[in-house]
């Protein structure tokens, strides 16, 4: 069987370049001569390019599967969101290792119909409303949903237990003796289609639900904005200006927590001396923040890899839906007042 690395070796380019050329990635900046050389070598070795695959549609013998990745975020939003970009990275790594073609980014409300006609299946990243699910299912038989399970009787899904993971973080703060807790978080969004355009609706955020049920906070100590570093900075400044900071904060994303740390530092306040922090997601930057963050680690790359495996399993004939809930790990660092350790 001809592999991408065989073509790369003969063409004297990287495997990633070969994959993107054969996947007809128009955003790839490469000389026309190099592009044609890769295509010629692939055909010479008998590798099925996307163009060949299209011609063979409808024939009995099928080529390698072509997978689409549909994101509920815009390209700019996804680039700025380490959580979702890490899920995509896991998808791309698994596809690369299994030498499976994936399409360029498809975004809800902006995809072209002809792209869906070429796909064998799609992995959807993010929460989508029933109307958007119908739009997808009307065009594709096989879909796997990451971070959302819109129809457990029909579709595979991968996610985590947000409430349980949040309670573990909150209980950790209580176990350390903190009594007055505050919350900084964003608004959980569900994406849908209206007149062909992607729109977002605010829905219940399980992290906030867990916090309100567990901590019984003062209303002024619950600060809600958008999930971004800038908003974390703004909301912590607001908390500082109100006076009487809580003894500790549960912050619903590492990005927001990094912004919050900057606001505290500018105000001459120290973490955890003046207020402690536990955050959520476990992005790489959390370890290298000005005060290393105690955080709930979500295995986002593994979510992406699992999505590919489930979709391939479906394409190979499995009919019953499967739902995977991945575990999380509490990574304890200095921001909560402890020494570093992991708590599963």
Swiss-Prot record:
Induction, as annotated:
Negatively autoregulated. Induced by melibiose and raffinose.
Q: Which SMART domains match?
A: HTH_LACI
What start-end ranges are recorded for coiled-coil regions in this protein? none
* Location of the protein in the cell: Cytoplasm
Q: List residues of the HTH lacI-type domain.
A: 2-58
GO biological process assignments: regulation of DNA-templated transcription
Give the source's domain of life in one word: Bacteria
Reply yes or no: does the keyword Membrane apply. Answer: no
Q: What is its main location?
A: cytoplasm
GO MF terms listed in the record are:
DNA-binding transcription factor activity; transcription cis-regulatory region binding
Keyword vocabulary terms for this entry? Cytoplasm, DNA-binding, Repressor, Transcription, Transcription regulation
Recorded hits in InterPro entries, A to Z, give: HTH_LacI (IPR000843), LacI/GalR-like_sensor (IPR046335), Lambda_DNA-bd_dom_sf (IPR010982), Peripla_BP_I (IPR028082)
Q: Which stretches hold the DNA-binding feature?
A: 4-23
GO annotation, cellular component aspect: cytoplasm
Query: Which PROSITE patterns does this chain map to?
Result: HTH_LACI_1, HTH_LACI_2
User: What does it do?
Assistant: Represses the melibiose operon melREDCA in the absence of melibiose or raffinose. Binds to two binding sites at the promoter region of the operon.
Query: Which PANTHER family has this protein been placed in?
Result: HTH-TYPE TRANSCRIPTIONAL REGULATOR EBGR, LACI-RELATED TRANSCRIPTIONAL REPRESSOR
Protein's UniProt name: HTH-type transcriptional repressor MelR
Q: Which organism is it from?
A: Bacillus subtilis (strain 168)
């Amino acid at each position: 069987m001809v592999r991408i690395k065989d073509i790369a070796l003969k063409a004297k380019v990287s495997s990633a370049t070969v994959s993107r050329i054969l996947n007809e990635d128009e955003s790839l900046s490469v000389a026309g001569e190099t592009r044609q050389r890769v295509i010629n070598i692939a055909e010479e070795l008998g590798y099925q390019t996307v163009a060949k695959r299209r011609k063979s549609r409808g024939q009995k013998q099928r080529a390698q599967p072509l997978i689409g990745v549909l994101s509920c975020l815009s390209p700019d939003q996804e680039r700025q969101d380490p959580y979702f970009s890490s899920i995509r990275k896991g998808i791309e790594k698994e596809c690369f290792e299994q030498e499976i073609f994936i399409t360029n980014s498809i975004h809800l409300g902006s995809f072209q119909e002809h792209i869906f006609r070429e796909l064998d299946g799609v992995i959807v990243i993010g929460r989508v409303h029933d109307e958007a699910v119908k739009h997808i299912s009307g065009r594709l038989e096989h879909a796997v949903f990451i971070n959302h399970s819109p129809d457990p009787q029909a579709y595979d899904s991968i996610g985590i237990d947000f409430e349980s993971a949040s309670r573990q973080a909150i209980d950790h703060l209580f176990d350390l003796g903190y009594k007055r807790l505050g919350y900084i978080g964003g608004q959980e969004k569900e994406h849908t289609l209206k007149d062909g355009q992607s729109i977002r609706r605010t829905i219940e955020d399980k992290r906030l639900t867990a916090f309100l049920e567990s901590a019984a906070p003062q209303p002024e100590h619950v600060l809600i904005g958008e999930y971004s570093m800038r908003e974390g900075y703004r909301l912590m400044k607001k908390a500082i200006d109100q006076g009487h900071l809580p003894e500790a904060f549960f912050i619903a994303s590492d990005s927001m927590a990094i912004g919050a740390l900057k606001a505290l530092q500018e105000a001459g306040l120290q973490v955890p001396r003046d207020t402690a922090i536990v955050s959520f997601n476990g992005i790489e930057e959390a370890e290298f923040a000005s005060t290393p963050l105690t955080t709930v680690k979500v295995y986002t790359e593994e979510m992406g890899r699992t999505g590919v495996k489930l979709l391939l399993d479906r394409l190979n004939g499995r009919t019953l839906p499967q739902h995977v809930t991945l575990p999380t790990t509490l990574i304890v660092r200095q921001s909560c007042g402890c020494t570093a350790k992991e708590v599963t």
